[in-house]
Amino acid sequence: MDILVPLLQLLVLLLTLPLHLMALLGCWQPLCKSYFPYLMAVLTPKSNRKMESKKRELFSQIKGLTGASGKVALLELGCGTGANFQFYPPGCRVTCLDPNPHFEKFLTKSMAENRHLQYERFVVAPGEDMRQLADGSMDVVVCTLVLCSVQSPRKVLQEVRRVLRPGGVLFFWEHVAEPYGSWAFMWQQVFEPTWKHIGDGCCLTRETWKDLENAQFSEIQMERQPPPLKWLPVGPHIMGKAVK
């Protein structure tokens, strides 16, 4: 099976050669940054419909995590189009962070559709460097389908712990690698070099549960879920929470 991977990767590369040439010349990334929000605006509602009950179950736990202000200070890391807003309890003070500024107009639309929330600001920055946010300033951090595409999950989780107050909670929902040695994992390996370009850096074979377990949270609760959109090469999902 391992012998097949480089051969099939080469075949996929040849079939998508223009994309890889554009990436090599530096033309693809700006284009990807522009179109990716539109792609997410199409895919996330479909995913939300599939996972609605589980998301409501996960995010219903936010309600009791109010800070000194009497409201929940919530940071959505890699906020994208704001697809999670509908699941947050009323009164949350939401700060949005994403490295892609092209998401802002989609966020504006989501804000208008979710008046039960209080919006603080949109920060354009990578998760590895959230210096614009103060230490211990957040009661809750939400991270959904983000750790697959960051440069360093370890650094992102360090920053998450820094901005969370003591007792603050990270809620996560991430796709991860299929079981090692399975045919599904083999196909993830085959598609990953091309998928990273299509998906704005998204990696198919990350073992994100290990990063969470090694991030020095005081408590972690985690469960695995099947992928909501089975026609995509993304694997099973992990959902849960981690307490600082």
UniProtKB/Swiss-Prot annotation:
Residues 1-23 form the signal peptide. It is found in: Endoplasmic reticulum membrane; Lipid droplet; Microsome; Cytoplasm, Cytosol. Its EC number is 2.1.1.9. It comes from the Eukaryota. Keywords: Cytoplasm, Endoplasmic reticulum, Lipid droplet, Membrane, Methyltransferase, Microsome, S-adenosyl-L-methionine, Signal, Transferase. The keyword Membrane applies. One of its GO terms (molecular function) is S-adenosylmethionine-dependent methyltransferase activity. Pfam families: Methyltransf_11 (PF08241). It catalyses: a thiol + S-adenosyl-L-methionine = a methyl thioether + S-adenosyl-L-homocysteine + H(+). One of its GO terms (cellular component) is cytosol. Expressed in the liver. It is a peripheral membrane protein. One of its GO terms (biological process) is methylation. Methylates drugs such as 7alpha-thiospironolactone, L-penicillamine and captopril. Thiol S-methyltransferase that catalyzes the transfer of a methyl group from S-adenosyl-L-methionine to alkyl and phenolic thiol-containing acceptor substrates. Together with TMT1B accounts for most of S-thiol methylation activity in the endoplasmic reticulum of hepatocytes. Selectively methylates S-centered nucleophiles from metabolites such as hydrogen sulfide and dithiothreitol. Belongs to the methyltransferase superfamily. This is Thiol S-methyltransferase TMT1B. The gene is TMT1B.
